[in-house]
């Protein structure tokens, strides 16, 4: 609690699970069931804030949420009719439940940060990555109802906790992953969404990193894609979140911005 470099607790990485294994499915409702991620997050936050009341509390989403007319007792899918009863999302990316049952931190509500994760078709060919997808089509089919509404309705601050992926021709020959990365990057710039990029190291098998060749080479192309989404002034100087200390040798402090 005395370490002032720790500003937030991300309570759990990527809660997930589907109804085909109910005991392992993270859900989001107003119950006190042991697999209710909302309730678990509120309990965990209470414990953390009792020790350090100054921290931000980051809460990720879940994987699935029941479609209209169904509840958490529905099976994952009716294979005879090919009917799906849940809205799917990336692990940690589904905040549909927060619309009716938002996280309640009591007197610490202003310290809540919702944190979705988002990835491209090289991680998994989700339905919204159909041929000809655009930023607008992903927004309509996935982003808005799963997490973007939280920003638009000013429910709580939003941090894109993970986004990233391959952009080289070997891994992304048709350019679809690069297209998704660009769509999300531009959305975050347009809406001033905070984010943390996944990842620096090269040994993340389905995304790669900002370095390669046994950590010896900086990926200039990938950095060039990410760089416009990093906070900088009109002269390209990166801006620190600290009012006193600049970020890096060529950056500026928040007070100097």
Where are the predicted features?
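Aromatic-rich peripheral "rim/lid" segments of glycoside hydrolase catalytic domains that contact
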Residues: 169-257
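Extracellular glycoside hydrolase catalytic/binding regions
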Residues: 3-7, 12-191
């Amino acid at each position: 609690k005395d370490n002032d470099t720790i500003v937030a607790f991300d309570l759990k990485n990527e809660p997930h699970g589907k109804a085909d294994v109910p005991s392992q499915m993270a859900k989001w409702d107003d119950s006190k069931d042991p697999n209710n991620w909302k309730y678990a997050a509120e309990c965990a936050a209470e414990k953390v804030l009792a020790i350090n009341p100054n921290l931000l509390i980051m809460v990720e989403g879940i994987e699935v949420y029941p479609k209209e007319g169904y509840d958490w007792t529905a099976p994952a899918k009716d294979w005879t009719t090919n009917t799906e009863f849940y809205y799917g999302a990336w692990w940690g990316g589904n905040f549909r439940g927060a619309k009716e049952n938002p996280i309640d931190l009591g007197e610490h509500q202003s310290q809540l940060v919702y944190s979705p994760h988002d990835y491209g078709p090289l991680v998994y060919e989700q339905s919204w990555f159909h041929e000809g997808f655009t930023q607008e089509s992903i927004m309509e089919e996935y982003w808005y109802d799963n997490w973007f509404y939280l920003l638009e309705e000013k429910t709580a601050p939003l941090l894109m906790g993970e986004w990233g992926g391959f952009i080289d021709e070997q891994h992304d020959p048709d350019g679809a992953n690069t297209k998704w990365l660009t769509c999300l990057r531009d959305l975050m710039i347009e809406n001033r969404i905070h984010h943390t990029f996944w990842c620096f190291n090269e040994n993340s098998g389905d995304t790669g990193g900002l370095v390669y060749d046994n950590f010896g080479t900086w990926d200039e192309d990938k950095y060039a894609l990410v760089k416009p989404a990093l906070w900088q002034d009109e002269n390209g100087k990166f801006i620190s979140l600290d009012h006193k200390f600049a970020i890096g040798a060529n950056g500026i402090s928040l007070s100097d911005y």
